């Protein structure tokens, strides 16, 4: 979707794909559970941990929530997606696309969105601006607030076979 504006120019498509693969495309945004830590003392949001996120996902695309929280040294707290995050999402998604095409917001482990965050995102998710896509990823769809679920199109993706995961991890070393 982030390459769709480059219909004819193969070099631009390759450039966009490289940015996507390195998770650095300026129109690809990620939100994930965080909390305060030694690095961030208050109002923690995903933007404070974006480098660690990219590194973690590139290293292990199958990372679990507990592995993620351990990676960012949040051990005695629950990771969550807070109202502060909703404010960041609203800011980011109100801007024009950097490269002139789609904007994509991936919310990983969306079931960790607190009620205040969900309520603040309702209108944006229901009526996103043109060429805006939200992907809410969850392991527990029943934990997502019904008001959010009702505004989304559900696509079930079965879990990846553990054998495939093991083979992929072995290949990576």
Set out the residue ranges of the language-model regions.
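Structural recognition of the conserved hydrophobic beta-strand(s) that form the central parallel beta-sheet
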Residues: 104-108, 121, 132-138
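Alpha-helix C-cap/termination motif
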Residues: 96-99, 127-128, 172
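Conserved adenine-binding aromatic site and its adjacent loop/helix in ATP-hydrolyzing domains
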Residues: 91, 123, 150
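Clamp-loader machinery-focused feature within the broader ASCE/P-loop NTPase space
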Residues: 1-112, 116
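Charged, glycine-rich active-site and insertion segments that engage polyanionic ligands
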Residues: 1-22, 130-133, 139-173
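Generic recognition of short, well-ordered alpha-helical segments
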Residues: 116-120, 147
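Conserved catalytic/switch belt of AAA+ P-loop NTPases
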Residues: 94, 119-130
């Amino acid at each position: 979707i982030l390459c769709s504006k480059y219909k004819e120019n193969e070099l631009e498509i390759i450039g966009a794909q490289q940015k996507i693969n390195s998770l650095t495309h300026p129109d690809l945004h990620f939100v994930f559970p965080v909390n305060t830590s030694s690095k961030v003392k208050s109002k923690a949001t995903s933007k404070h941990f974006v480098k660690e996120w990219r590194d973690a996902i590139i290293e292990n695309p199958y990372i679990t929530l507990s592995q993620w929280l351990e990676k960012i040294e949040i051990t005695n707290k629950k990771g969550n997606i807070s109202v502060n995050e909703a404010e960041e999402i609203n800011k980011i998604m109100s801007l024009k696309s950097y490269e002139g095409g789609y904007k994509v917001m991936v919310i990983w482990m969306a079931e960790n969105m607190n009620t205040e965050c969900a309520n603040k995102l309702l209108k944006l998710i229901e009526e996103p601006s043109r060429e805006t896509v939200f992907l809410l990823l969850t392991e527990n769809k029943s934990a997502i607030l019904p008001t959010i679920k009702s505004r989304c199109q559900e696509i079930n993706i079965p879990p990846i076979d553990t054998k495939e995961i093991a083979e992929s991890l072995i290949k990576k070393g």
